[in-house]
Structure formats: C-alpha cells, structure tokens
C-alpha cells in the first residue's frame, strides 16, 4: 500500500528526483492534480530528456464550491483553517477562477514543453483515456 510522505503536492521535487535517478530516455507518466507552483524549470528539462505525459486526475466535485453556507475549510497542503461563506458569489467566483487558472497553467506548460496531456476524472476509466491517447499519438 502506498502512503504519501506529505499531503502537499510537490511536482518539482518529483521531477528532480526522476531526472537524477533515470539516466536513459524513458516514457514517463506524471500523475497529479497539478495544483502546484514552481515546477516550470524541472518540467522543461524533464520534457526534453523523457517522453513525458502529464495525467491530471481530478474530481468533478472539486471544480466548484456548492452553496452550503458558512463552513470551515482546511487547506490540505498548508493545514490552515478558514471559515468561508460558500453562499458568497465572490467566494465561489474566486474559487472557480483559481481552479480554472491551475488547469490552464497545466495545459499551457505541458504544451509549451512538448509534453503529452491527459485529463482523467476519478470516475472515468483511465484505460479508455490511455487507449485514446495512444491512438492519437500513433
């Protein structure tokens, strides 16, 4: 069973580890929600060295905040607790804007560096997604 060392996403650290450990050309699949910063440099290097594909795993429920009133929200990565009014249009708009910005960043960084992209919801068949991806590349 896999147990993460940390709840914080650190794509840069993962890519740097990969660059140090794997010396030959390889096909690499990087699975993440890609809600992270500061991995541009290591992504650029890794995408030149490897046949790299980013697989963004996401839950459709995470794309928007439902209107359920004032709720405590703990940032899973920082551990910070905040009370948030989910009925607020501004709160929901800011959340959606930030979420969409992360997705666009992932797509633009991977495209810019010539890396492959797969988006896969947690309730979808990853096998179908991979087969479709390989058919497009063939």
Per-region residue spans from a language model:
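Active-site glycine- and acidic-residue-rich loops that bind
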Residues: 31-37, 52
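Domain-scale detector for complete catalytic domains at protein termini or as standalone homologs
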Residues: 28-32, 115
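Short, well-ordered alpha-helical microsegments
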Residues: 37-40, 127
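Von Willebrand factor
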Residues: 1-26, 36-38, 58-59
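Von Willebrand factor type A / integrin I
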Residues: 17-24, 44-138
């Amino acid at each position: 069973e896999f147990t993460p060392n940390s709840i914080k996403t650190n794509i840069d650290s993962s890519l740097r580890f990969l660059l140090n450990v794997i010396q030959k050309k390889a096909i690499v699949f990087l699975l993440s929600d890609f809600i992270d910063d500061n991995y541009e440099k290591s992504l650029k290097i890794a995408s030149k060295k490897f046949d790299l594909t980013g697989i963004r795993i996401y839950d459709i429920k995470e794309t928007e905040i439902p209107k359920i009133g004032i709720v405590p929200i703990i940032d899973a990565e920082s551990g910070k607790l905040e009370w948030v009014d989910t009925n607020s249009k501004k709160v929901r708009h800011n959340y959606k804007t930030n979420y969409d910005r992360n997705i666009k960043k992932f797509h633009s960084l991977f495209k810019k560096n010539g890396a492959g992209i797969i988006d896969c919801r947690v309730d979808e068949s990853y096998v179908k997604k991979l087969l479709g991806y390989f058919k497009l590349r063939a």
